[in-house]
Amino acid sequence: MRKTTISLVFLLLTLTAWCQQANYAKMSSMVRQLAMETTGRMRRMPSAGDRELCAFVRIEGNADSLLALYGGRSLARFGNLHVASIPLRSLSPLSLRPEVSRIEARQGNSIQMDTTLVLLGGAKAHAGELLPQAFTGRGVVVGVQDIGFDLTHPNFYDTSLSEYRIKRMWDFLSLDTLGSDLYVGAEYTTEEALKTYAHSRDAHIISHGTHTLGCAAGSGYDTSYRGMAPGSDICLVSNAVTEDISLIDSADVYKYTYALDALGFKYIFDYAKSVGKPCVVSFSEGSMMDFRGDDALYYEMLDSLVGPGRIIVASAGNAGHQVAHVVKPVGMESARVALISGGSSGYFSVKTTSDDYMLDFVLYGPDNARQTYLLRPVDIYLRSDSLLTDTLEVGGKPYYITATRYPSYYNAAEEVVEVIVGTDKRLGLDYYAGVDLKGENVELEMFRGGGYLVPEDESLGSSAYSIHSPSSAPAVICTGATGYRTQYVNYKGDLHVYNKGSNGERSDYSSVGPTFDGRVKPDVMAPGTNIISSYSSYYLEACPDASDIESDVEHFEFNGRTYAWNSNSGTSMSTPVAAGAIALWLEADPTLSRDDVMEVIRQTSRRYDESLEYPNNFYGYGEIDAYKGLLYILGLSDIKEISDHQPAAVRFSLSEDGRLCLGFPHPYAKPVMVRVFATSGTEVMSTQVLPEGGMAAVDLGALPRGVYAIQVCASDQALTGSTLIRR
């Protein structure tokens, strides 16, 4: 009876709302648009309001009862902040409730691969140069929220193939929903269930997650292409982004928002908590920042999710080689910017503290037809809801211009005008489209939203403010990409060259800061250009002629299927590399918080260009150094006798009975000093060895079990350095 009563109240409330205004000021732009569209559609078709939106909502008081009155429910709660499912018909009436102060949702994530080319193999990350012997991520959960997972790839076993390391997965797009308590999709929680399911639903159209997971936690199988934390446990969330949206039923499309991604992060952390292990989550997705504050509650939720032993790492974005910011200074009468998009529309924002300016559009059509369109801020202000929409025809070619204005979320003294320019075909490519920023007495800042900005005066443009969200969030560790190798040979024997920097130089595509509220981002860098990792056998099977298959470096058979190792580039790759390094640190200290990790990064990162001040908006604090970070966490970095780097040309192995073997370049046969330090800093052994046949051995069998630093000193600098071993 109670359920029936609530349903009747819900119907009455939503029907009454047709005659009321919504409080649009409480809504993010997507929620506002959905509320307005739904009100109109419901007049024609009442069932249009039945679809659900997954949103962030701030509610004071009894949120469960309030949401139930409007047909909604809370899916997760942190204080007065909820992730909630809300029928579209309820958005307007819910916004009128005094208990509700904000409703927020956003879509538009895309994966962060460098789409210029997809090439090569990142030796620094995956040939073991950063990997200490004593720490492999054991006892740590590495979470990856991504798309396109092949759960059967041997990279996700241990090296002996005796342990399957994926412990569970939530697939947002799974159709196995019968009996599932999850908001969307289904979870797979046993080895048998995971292997039977075999792959995320989208793995036949994309392999992104298979690659990023390998970067973070792959064992390498029988190759050197291992991830940073090959001993870790794995928990996955296969979410939904632009690239796999075609698999979503149109009735459910508004369930797949950033709020649902937040539930994905929570799912991974909840699993780690249930098994009593620390966790780092890698997220190689994102979208452009905005001035509307549409991610404000998202950032609060992320801040609530992280803590001691709970870290989120996200990709900076791959827009660093594009103009994202144009400045027309005071004293300059105008600055022309071409507008280009591979699609039919593009959008940009203009920010300033004055209304004393104009946007003068110059649009072309067939037969050299030309037309201008003058847009002043006051024109927008005079329209209802501060929304201007206009259409033009230039030589038979249609254009439409939509503009809105609002105060910047980050500084209310600054006004933002947001403009969408659209046409019937590719904007600015078939016929020129541009805008003159006019106003001699005012500085105008123009920001890229969608499409591309090409200033006539190149000196006015830069890649500043190109960092993506959610890596722009204060609680998230934002990772940019560096380059090392510049060429590779694919599985066909073809040589490919892709030079995006060497020796740890920032790859030009890696997005740069600051954030719109002025914070330095990225936080850290990691190898991201030309990284070799695992690729989906199901994608290879379904799309054998896809362009990215050309960057496969090897195909091999395992359990009757053909798998691949593939080269890829982007901050999508650097992010899991950084996350895997942090997993090693969490193994050393499971209580590390985000601030603790940032302090390790600040103290130990490698700085490519010492002439720069750090942190900066290109490199953050520098490139992550997993080994040097471990020395810092273990308290060994201040012991001058211990090098802060591993010997480049020495390989170590340790037998169960404590015999430490050192491999040297043959035929090196000069004396080598080996010193052994406990983590207390005490030297517990010192001996000199003479390599024979490129090998030498030291017996550590008498030492107690534990972690030790091994310092090797030789006349050859490549043979000098330290490593960590676990006795």
What are these regions (language model features)?
Residues M27-S47, S90, I111-S162, E192-H208, ...:
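N-terminal domain-start motif of subtilase-like serine proteases
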Residues F149-T210, G227-A229, V275, P366-G449, ...:
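Active-site core segment of subtilase-fold serine proteases
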